[in-house]
Amino acid sequence: MPGDFSVCVCISPPPQPQFHCSPADSLRPCLVPTRRPPDPRKKNVVFADALGLALTSVRHFTRAFFDEEPLVLALASLRALRPLSSPTYTLDFSPPTQDYGRYREQLTRKLVCLEQCAVQGAAVAGTVRVRNVGYEKRVTLRVSYDGWCNHYDLPCTYLFDTRRGGDTDSFSFRMPLPVGTERAEFCICYWCAGEEYWDNNDGKNYSLHKEGKGKGYLQGPYW
């Protein structure tokens, strides 16, 4: 006997295509950076010695450069630019030739005498007249700036004078006045024919002082 069959047909949707991508591909940026075109200019390197120049520059420093403070050096430079006023000195004696009779008498008696003297800035300039008692002669100034604790002999220069006769000779001198000098004193020594003759202003010596320090003679030896 024929049987009855029932058929149930199930229709499923077609399979969807699957795409596989690696994790690295999913992290790649979507923007691509723009590249700049290469610079057509080339860079050249040239060393100094190729141009005839020195490869190194050397500067030498002294120890004083590191020892001195910059501020001290700057202040010293400013002080050097400050104008300084020169001190004024006054002679403590009258010009010897002011009393010409006494001047001639002393020249005859002592054979040596201060003739002229004047202060010229930071020095004292003058002339000395001596009697010509020999061919070889020497005239010096004996000077002291500290009351004869120390003294110095300053040679004088012979002056050739054709207007005078041969009985006298003249010598010139220029005595410096160092910075800080307040008083100075000098006398004159004339050496000729093995003998010494002195002009010491009759035992007082010739002296001068800086203005504002007072007039007075320094105590010391007299020749």
From Swiss-Prot:
InterPro entries: CBM21_dom, CBM21_dom_sf, Pase-1_reg-su_3B/C/D_met, PP1_regulatory_subunit_3. Keywords: Carbohydrate metabolism, Glycogen metabolism. It comes from the Eukaryota. One of its GO terms (biological process) is glycogen metabolic process. The keyword Transport does not apply. Residues 104-209 form the CBM21 domain. Pfam families: CBM_21. Interacts with PPP1CC catalytic subunit of PP1 and associates with glycogen. Forms complexes with glycogen phosphorylase, glycogen synthase and phosphorylase kinase which is necessary for its regulation of PP1 activity. Acts as a glycogen-targeting subunit for PP1 and regulates its activity. Activates glycogen synthase, reduces glycogen phosphorylase activity and limits glycogen breakdown. The N-terminal region is required for binding to PP1, the central region is required for binding to glycogen and the C-terminal region is required for binding to glycogen phosphorylase, glycogen synthase and phosphorylase kinase. This is Protein phosphatase 1 regulatory subunit 3C. The gene is ppp1r3c.
